[in-house]
Structures are given as C-alpha cells and as structure tokens.
Regions:
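Bacterial Sec-dependent N-terminal signal peptides
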Residues: 1-26
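Sec-dependent signal peptide cleavage junction
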Residues: 18-63, 70
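Helix-rich interaction surfaces within compact, conserved domain-sized segments
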Residues: 25-28, 127-197
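N-terminal post-signal-peptidase region of extra-cytosolic proteins
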Residues: 55-56, 73-89
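Well-ordered beta-strand positions
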Residues: 63, 94, 101, 156-158
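Extended beta-sheet lipid-handling architectures
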Residues: 64-66, 71-73, 88, 95
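Solvent-exposed coil/turn segments that connect beta secondary-structure elements
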Residues: 74-76, 96-98, 105-107, 145, ...
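Mid-length scaffold segments of soluble, non-membrane domains
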Residues: 83-137
Length: 197
C-alpha cells in the first residue's frame, strides 16, 4: 500500500511539473509573438516616416533648384552660441527668382521697424551656387544685396530631411546668425511678411 501511495504521489508530482512546463512554454511563445508583432509595427512606422522625410527632402531640393523656397525658422542662433526659439511664420529666409527676403521677429512688446517685433530686409540674390557632396548633403549659397542688407547666406541641408540651417553673414560686420528650421517650396509655406526697410 505504501508503495502504491508513493508511486501515485510521484506520478501526480510529475504530471504537475509537466503541466507547469507546458504553461510556461505557451506563455513564452505568446510573449515572443507579441514581441515580433511590436517589432514589425515599429519597422513599418519607421519606414513610413523615412518615406515621408525623403519626399520632403526631394521637394526641398527641387525648390532650391527652382529658386522658389522659404526656410521657416524654429530657432535663431547668434554669434557666440546663444539662441532663441522663434515663431516659424514670422522668422524666415526666402527666395523667389532673384529676390531674397530675410525676416527676424521676436515675440515681445516692441514692434520694430517691420511692425511685428523685428526687421525685414529685401534684396537681390547673386552668386547663387548649389552643391551636393558625396553623402548627398546639400549646400546652397547666395549673396543678398539690398537697401538694408549686404550679406552672404549659406544653407546646409542633410540628406533625407528638409531640416535646414541658413547662416546669414553680413559683409560689414561679424554679427552672423543662423536660422534653423524646415525648408519648403513657397506655395507650401505659411509666413507673414512685415514691412521691409
């Protein structure tokens, strides 16, 4: 009788262990399937973002070639590393044909010469050059001459995105500044231009 009870106890214990292992392996397989689904979803989302970013890049490159673009700045960087976050609709560098506009407007109580808190200068663009390096990054440069401006403007746009930096370097002083933001074709831009000098 003792042997039968001992044998029965061993069988029940062994069956319980097997069931626990089966439950663990089923749980492990479910977790692995969930992990694979999340990984596939993340890869699809990244591919969609990359496709959208590349489309914006191609659009921006064509706008540079057509000389019909606007760089809407989200941030303005000054000479010694200080910077300010700004409103993209009122801070921009644009070009349409051979005419260029540079506008800087801060959010404050002072209206400035352009009526919106800063300065707007128009000028004629010359010495326009566009280059693509071996990695596909774009550089675009021009000289802007006008009533209130005489400066060189250099754009840098990395491959695969329409994020761009335009550095404005005045010819008569060293107070350069950089506009950092997104570059769009003029018809897709939503900027407000103040009074120019």
């Amino acid at each position: 009788m003792k042997k039968v009870l001992l044998l029965l106890a061993v069988l029940l214990f062994g069956a319980g262990s097997m069931m626990a292992q089966q439950d663990k392996s089923a749980e492990k397989a479910a977790k692995q399937a969930e992990k694979e689904a999340k990984k596939a979803e993340k890869a699809a989302k990244k591919a969609a973002e990359d496709a959208e970013s590349n489309a914006l890049f191609e659009q921006a490159v064509q706008a540079l070639k057509d000389r019909d673009f606007v760089l809407e700045a989200e941030r303005v960087e000054f000479k010694r590393g200080s910077f300010a976050y700004v409103t993209p609709s009122t801070n921009f560098v644009s070009m349409k044909g051979n005419k260029a506009t540079i506008q800087l407007a801060f959010n404050g109580s002072f209206s400035g010469p352009n009526g919106i808190g800063g300065i707007t200068v128009d000028g004629n663009a010359s010495n326009v050059e566009m280059k693509t390096d071996k990695k596909g990054n774009i550089t675009f440069s021009m000289m802007v001459q006008g009533v209130g401006v005489s400066a060189s403007v250099n754009f840098r746009m990395p491959k695969g995105t329409n994020k761009c930096t335009a550095t404005v370097s005045p010819n008569f002083n060293s107070n350069r500044m950089s506009f950092v933001g997104n570059l769009y074709p003029s018809e897709q831009s939503n900027v407000y231009k103040g009074r120019s000098l």
